[in-house]
Amino acid sequence: MPARAAGAGVELSRLSAFKPDLYHRAWSSIPHPTLPLIATAHEKSVTVFSLSTLSAHSNLTGGHTRSVRCAVWKPNLPSGKLCLVTASFDSTAGLWRWEGDVPLEEGTKKGESTEIDVTRRRNNNDSDKDNDDDWEFTLVLEGHENEIKSAAFSPSGQYLATCSRDKSIWIWEDVGANEGDDEWETVAVLTEHDGDVKCVAWCPDVPGRNISSYSPDVLASASYDDTIRIWREDGDGEWACVAVLEGHSSTVWGVQWEPKVDNTKFPRLISWSADKTIRVWTLEQDDPEASLSQPGAVQSPFKSGLGGIPNTMRRTLKEEWRCSAVLPSVHTRDIYSASWSKNGRVASTGSDGSILVYEECAPSNPSTTPADLEEGDSNVIVKPGEAKWKVLGKVSDGHGPYEINHITWCSRYDAGVEQRGVEEMLVTTGDDGIVQAWQLKESIEL
């Protein structure tokens, strides 16, 4: 039964699993940012599924000698173009481009489906070779010494970050004159973490990211050393760690930025850990900076972010981040994955096989503090009036006895939804090789 909070909650029910079953451990499933496609990493390959039919669209095989840990979509490509980067345990990242002639029809109205004709691409008689003919493996990125655990594109697609068991983060830049030239250069190798780097995530291109005090490209990383680090580019091509976020007591498996914020606040960050907690992190922004938006304000030549700081001063520059919330502790083992939806809800899953959905709600009294914080947790600093979190729903043993490795929110395009591309669903990926879609229904206790 789903958990309830404050008389309301959500019920999670299974939609159809994506077909075909993969029959081997699957690591993650990443939705395309604008199209009804989702890429699942498993074994030495990637299966791209259609979100319209919940069936396979195409396969990417033959590029790696060991398991593919994740696959990420390059954003902002011209219509009809697809590009994926795969991160593998063979210590390389591969770049793939779709060279097929499948028609892509962009929706023109809010909620209108973005269609992809997948019926021509796959039927029960197709061979794997037929299904990957239209994906071209165009480039191998080499440099890491051990398994690559995660990869992520910056919002513009100019930068790609990869991280590895070798404790390093590599930042690659697309320096090709035209899209498809596939010319990439290493612009930074970051080695400050003391353990495996499990995850990298770029701050999304939301209004709050572009406050004048900050450089636009911001990267977060999570590590086996129990910390999160924040990285920025200084305007001269140098990348620096500007903050170390401490509070978790075990491996930090991942981080994700808040996908939708108002115009004045820098996006928050969530992290999840082997310590069975999910934490929310907030950047402490200087009030004087906010005053610069007032008429007649004068911009100081020395910003509180990296831009504008002389080289001799950059080493001492630090940002102040605080843990502003800990979500209710329900998981009984490692939390492997969490996802923040565009409507503000958070979903999580992990080693215990449970799926949790949380929601943030403002306290009734602005002077109160959240009641769901870990007792005696001195790392949590809550300011008056900040919201608390509650559990909206729970499913136990979502993939039976198997661990669930990944969870993500994505838009629904299947035939069972009225507003295609508007309503969200959850997708979980597990050790059983199943990619499972979940529907959320609002419920109210009378």
Curated annotation (Swiss-Prot):
Keyword Repeat: yes
Taxonomic superkingdom: Eukaryota
Residue ranges with Basic and acidic residues bias: 106-128
Gene3D superfamilies linked to this entry: YVTN repeat-like/Quinoprotein amine dehydrogenase
Protein name as annotated: Probable cytosolic iron-sulfur protein assembly protein 1
UniProt keyword terms in alphabetical order: Repeat, WD repeat
Family designation: Belongs to the WD repeat CIA1 family.
Keyword Repeat applies: yes
PANTHER family for this protein: CYTOSOLIC IRON-SULFUR PROTEIN ASSEMBLY PROTEIN CIAO1-RELATED, WD40 PROTEIN CIAO1
GO CC, any one term: cytosolic [4Fe-4S] assembly targeting complex
InterPro entries for the chain: CIAO1/Cia1, G-protein_beta_WD-40_rep, WD40/YVTN_repeat-like_dom_sf, WD40_repeat_dom_sf, WD40_rpt
The species this protein was found in: Pyricularia oryzae (strain 70-15 / ATCC MYA-4617 / FGSC 8958)
WD repeat extents: 17-59, 63-106, 143-182, 192-241, 247-291, 330-368, 398-446
Disulfide pattern: none
GO BP annotations, alphabetical order: iron-sulfur cluster assembly
Spans annotated as Disordered: 106-133
Function summary: Essential component of the cytosolic iron-sulfur (Fe/S) protein assembly machinery. Required for the maturation of extramitochondrial Fe/S proteins.
